[in-house]
């Protein structure tokens, strides 16, 4: 894989933030309120998987992964 630019890394980090926000909003009942439990669970599971993959990448510099790791833990404990 080619080296990522700083802009590409920033885009990945922003996308991770979107996953964090969505996981937290679903758990708080602020997102997907009209969806059934299976859809909410699937969405949380997919976003947790995305975060797990991205946190493990070796191209990160000084980016703070605290929110991502917290969302992973919260999502793993979530049952819709």
Residue ranges and their predicted role:
Residues 1-4, 38, 70-80:
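Short intrinsically disordered terminal tails
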Residues 3-28:
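N-terminal acidic leader/helix
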Residues 8-9, 46, 55, 74:
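A general marker of short, structured functional hotspots
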Residues 14, 28-31, 49, 53, ...:
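Intrinsic disorder/low-complexity segments
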Residues 15-22, 36, 40-52, 68:
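Short amphipathic alpha-helical heptad-repeat segments
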Residues 20, 31-39, 55-66, 80:
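Charged, low-complexity interaction regions
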Residues 12, 24, 56, 70-72:
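N-terminal start and proteolytic maturation junction detector
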